[in-house]
Structure formats: structure tokens, C-alpha cells
């Protein structure tokens, strides 16, 4: 099954609520829920929260939570400082060098720029998101300091009124002294 719901500005305060659930024949289950509340008390400050759950068949499950406090330069430019944590469970309890139970925590900083146009189907013409985090991973094997960088860029090239080329780039870098398979960044498929 598949569910992809996005509610934008339903309370007329600029809030965004997203809900995404996907379960496919490959025994993967993805659940993402997020809420963003901008301009709290009519100030340029806002908050957002995310919950991401990913289950890979009977191998492992990752649960990531994030809470960010943001400053809105304007509707197109935002800066967030936040806290992100992930808890991963090795469902088979093998706890070897490839897959293991772990918890990580990061202090994060995110800059977002989005350029919107008046197009009902594709209102987001340009998007640039840069996110970095500094923290540590604790597993049964060891504790490691970690740093990550994430860059997402997309742009729509309008050839004419009826034809658009959508360019999209997702980049992720994780610096660690060693890596566990269930902590690696996953992307791809029809949504990429």
C-alpha cells in the first residue's frame, strides 16, 4: 500500500503537515510524519518535528526523530537549529560488524531556500537544502563520534508551457571511524 498526504496552510498560519506510508512487496515499510509551524506568535520563529520509521524485512528497524527551532528570514529562506536521534534495532539479534543495535544523537543546523511559482501542479521551481550534524553513535560494539552533511538540490527547467525537465540531486556524507549497514543513508526509487 501507499499513502502520501500533504496539508498546507489549512489553519491559515503557514503550517505544513506531511504523512507518508509505503509498504511494498520487498518487505520494506516506510513511515514518515512531519509538522512545521512557522511564525509562532507572529514572530519569525517556528518549530518543526519529524518522525521517520524504516523497517527492512526481518533484518532491522530504524526510528528517527528530529525537533528543530527555526528562524524565517522570509517565506523562501529558513535556518533551523535542532536535535536529531535515531534508534536502530537488529531484529535478528545478530549484532555483528554489519548490522547492530545502535543509537545516535546529533545537534543539527539546516538552511533551506525554496523558490515558488504560480503553477498548481509543480509550485516549487527551485529547492536548496543544506543540513549538517555533529554527534555520536553508541552501539554494543563501540562508541563513535560522527559528522554528516546532506545537500538536496532540485530545479525545474521550463522548456515551454507544456514541457518541464525536473533536475534533482541528493547528496549525503557520513564521517565515522566505521559504518554499520543499518545506519547508512537510503534513497532511490520512484520518489527520487
Regions found by a protein language model. Give the residues of each.
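Gram-negative outer-membrane beta-barrel proteins
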Residues: 11-13, 25-27, 41, 55-59, ...
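Solvent-exposed loop/turn segments connecting transmembrane beta-strands
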Residues: 1, 19-31, 53-63, 101, ...
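Transmembrane beta-barrel strands of outer-membrane/channel proteins
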Residues: 3, 19-23, 47-53, 81-87, ...
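Transmembrane beta-barrel domains of outer membrane proteins
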Residues: 6-8, 34-38, 50-52, 68-72, ...
Amino acid at each position: 500500500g501507499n499513502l502520501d498526504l500533504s496539508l498546507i496552510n489549512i489553519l491559515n498560519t503557514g503550517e505544513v503537515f506531511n504523512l507518508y506510508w509505503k509498504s511494498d512487496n520487498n518487505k520494506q515499510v516506510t513511515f514518515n510524519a512531519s509538522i512545521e509551524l512557522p511564525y509562532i506568535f507572529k514572530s519569525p520563529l517556528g518549530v518543526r518535528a519529524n518522525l521517520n520509521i524504516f523497517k527492512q524485512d526481518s533484518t532491522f528497524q530504524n526510528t528517527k526523530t528530529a525537533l528543530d527551532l527555526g528562524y524565517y528570514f522570509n517565506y523562501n529562506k529558513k535556518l533551523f537549529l535542532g536535535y536529531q536521534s535515531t534508534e536502530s534495532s537488529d531484529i535478528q539479534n545478530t549484532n555483528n560488524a554489519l548490522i547492530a543495535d545502535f543509537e545516535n544523537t546529533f545537534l543539527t543546523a539546516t538552511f533551506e531556500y525554496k523558490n515558488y511559482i504560480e503553477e498548481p501542479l509543480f509550485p516549487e521551481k527551485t529547492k536548496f537544502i543544506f543540513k549538517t550534524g555533529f554527534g555520536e553513535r553508541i552501539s554494543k560494539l563501540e562508541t563513535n563520534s560522527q559528522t554528516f552533511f546532506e545537500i538536496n538540490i532540485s530545479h525545474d527547467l521550463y522548456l515551454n508551457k507544456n514541457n518541464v525537465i525536473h533536475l534533482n540531486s541528493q547528496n549525503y556524507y557520513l564521517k565515522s571511524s566505521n559504518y554499520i549497514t543499518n545506519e547508512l543513508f537510503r534513497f532511490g526509487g520512484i520518489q527520487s
